[in-house]
Regions:
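OB-fold and OB-like single-stranded nucleic-acid-recognition modules
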Residues: 24-131
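Bacterial N-terminal signal peptides
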Residues: 12-21
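Bacterial N-terminal signal peptides that target proteins for export
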Residues: 2-12
Length: 131
């Protein structure tokens, strides 16, 4: 009986160690609002907000599509960047038309380009429409 009691004292620590990774994963899966995205540069997050405008530069190298979140360019809170020339096969719709003025959540790595927060989007699976 004494051996069991001695082993039981380690049970809370063991539970904590086993469940901590689950807790950390759950935290990283918690959506954040687009206005907070700049705080998470260098991390992979789910970011939610309204795409207020889009721009497709068809003739530019890589065919970039810019999704401006929160506010119009050049004051956007975050830019979603789709290199449509490389990743068009991963979309069943035209992102620059379909996503304009939509409220969405996007999952990806948050980076910064020329002082602006951005996220590269490679597939429509990263994008979920929000009610």
């Amino acid at each position: 009986m004494k051996k069991i009691k001695n082993r039981m004292k380690y049970l809370p620590s063991l539970c904590f160690l086993l469940l901590s990774p689950l807790s950390l994963k759950a935290q990283s899966e918690q959506p954040i609002e687009v206005k907070e995205a700049y705080k998470y540069v260098g991390e992979t997050k789910i970011v939610c907000g309204r795409i207020v405008s889009t721009k497709y530069l068809k003739r530019a190298s890589g065919g970039p599509i810019f999704l401006n979140f929160g506010r119009d360019y050049p004051n956007q809170q975050m830019t979603g960047l789709i290199w449509f020339g490389r990743f068009s096969e991963y979309f069943t719709y035209k992102p620059e038309k379909f996503l304009k003025r939509k409220n969405v959540c996007v999952k990806g790595y948050i980076s910064e380009h020329e002082g602006k927060t951005q996220m590269e989007i490679r597939t429509e699976k990263q994008i979920k429409l929000r009610e």
